[in-house]
From Swiss-Prot:
It is a multi-pass membrane protein. Keywords: Cell membrane, Membrane, Transmembrane, Transmembrane helix, Transport. One of its GO terms (cellular component) is plasma membrane. This is Uncharacterized transporter YdhK. The gene is ydhK. It holds the Pfam family FUSC. Belongs to the aromatic acid exporter ArAE (TC 2.A.85) family. It comes from the Bacteria. It is found in: Cell membrane. GO terms for molecular function: transmembrane transporter activity. It comes from Salmonella typhimurium (strain LT2 / SGSC1412 / ATCC 700720).
Amino acid sequence: MKLSLPALRNTPWFKATSGQWRYALRNTIAMCLALTFAYYLNLDEPYWAMTSAAVVSFPTVGGVISKSLGRIAGSLLGATAALIIAGHTLNEPWLFLFSMAAWIGFCTWACAHFTNNAAYAFQLSGYTAAIIAFPMVNIVEITQLWDIAQARVCEVIVGILCGGMMMMILPSTSDGTALLTAFKNMHARLLEHASLLWQPETTDAIRSAHEGVIGQILTMNLLRIQAFWSHYRFRRQNALLNALLHQQLRLTSVISSLRRMLLNWPTPPENSREVIEQLLAELAKPRADSYTVAQIIAPLRPQDEQDYRHLAFWQRLRYFCQLYLRSSRQLYLIESGAPVDQIHIRRTPGLARHTDNAEAIWSGVRTFCTLTVIGAWSIGAQWESGPGALTLAAISCVLYSIVATPFKSLSLLMRTLVLLSLFSFVVKFGLMVQITDLWQFLLFLFPLFVTMQLLKLQMPKLAGLWGQLIVFMGSFIAVTNPPVYDFADFLNDNTAKIVGVAISWLAFAILRPGSDAVKSRRHIRALRRDFVDQLSRHPSHNESEFESLTYHHVSQLSNSQDALARRWLLRWGVVLLNCSHVVWQLRAWESRSDPLSRVRDICISLLRDVMSERGVQQRPLAVTLQELQRICDTLAHHHQPAAHELAAIIWRLHCSLSQLEQAPAQGTLAPGYLMTPQA
């Protein structure tokens, strides 16, 4: 039977692009080299080297370097912890179990407090300790502790070195190119986002678009970290890239602020929409300049000095144009490789983030309880394969405690383990028993891994499954030195691994992570607490830090299915962020008129009275809004131009707070979920 040409073209090998072939060959060769080197170094379980090479198979240089550093640090820390715990408690099974469960629970708690490399290092330290320590319960000689620990660390390092070497031989696309492309795409998308938000209607598409823009900007921080590790140029420009991220977040805030003003402006100019479209079209041009932009927005300049609404919109629109043009210029200089000294940009710290400490503690407790239950069962039943169940349970609890959908991830892992159990049985007892040399086995592995890598790239919906099959295949085939073919041990070990994941799934079902509604309430409470701090004389965060912290809170529920929780978290974030910008502008606003300064202080005190960590209280929101409106109308008739500017700023505060009038009535939400208790 002959294969037709269309059928051949549909195979993964013929469908693959050159980039996909490069990725598949690089990772496959790295895994085969890692297995070969570990085997000839006489490491007793060389398949861990192959697994390590698979784990660090990132598509970019910076990703490989950053993940490798985190993996080495985590492996060394985990091996040290395993040696200390096992060395002192191995003769006392219960003390050993509680100590290991406590350490892995601590690592689960700690990884929730960090991001990127640090979080990955704590994850590795947790389940590396499990991989090393739990199999030690079956050893007789205490001197074997060091041999096992150094063998596991050596296998990890061999896999990392092979992955790094293949990345140098078959490099992928530049991290810097990917970062700059993402910056430019986001810069252009902000104009599209402005055109969408500056429309009078309110739809779910607008909310989703706003969440999407926030999430994409925060995701670029990961690209910045990868670029930092890939090239010295981006290490020198790291502070500038941080500043660009903050500027894009500020542009998002200004777009939202202008939207609030347009929605609360009773009589905007008739030509405002036409002028805005012309402005956005001009800003989209690569050579846009300040003079042309000024000519376009000139028709929107307020003619009536007492029209504080028009003045507020005009000032904020000018600020948006200035900030966008400045960002365009700075992005062009960074892309063209200009020296750092020539790029005039304010250096800012990295993006701020918040840790849900209650959820982190709960995850640590869940890990401790899961391992304790499995360990108690193993000790009581004298289950020889108990270490395998403990190891897989530790990996599951540590890895999936910080994912958004742990049940989906654990179900996928269960599916992976069942498929690998069947496949490894055929490979081990049908093929490997007939192989006498390693090179013969590599001839089988090489095309297999290449095909799986290509399928992972060509089937995005099943990429997670193919990735787990590649990573866990080594531990199921278990290429040991020397090889061992014992069907009873094979069956018991695979059963133990599946049981360990199943009990982890059960633990997540019993000790469930907080619901999205609960998480939303905690994030909103933290937002209000940080905003109250912003009203103090010496706030803990400056304007940019509070802005990035707020957007980090909002992004935490971007994948939530609870639309109400997600909507109110976004609404509170936008309201408090717009209010904080007004507060910082009021602080910077100065006038020689003492009465005007007192008016400014009154507005800040109104915010202190109306906002607390528990919500809007002490003064009804409607009364506060009426007071702000009265102040604006009074200042509009003042003879000093500074009073008109102050009225414009206060009206922006009124527009921001008015969004909280849409809070649901008490009793329509779950207990404790009321956003504005006295609205």
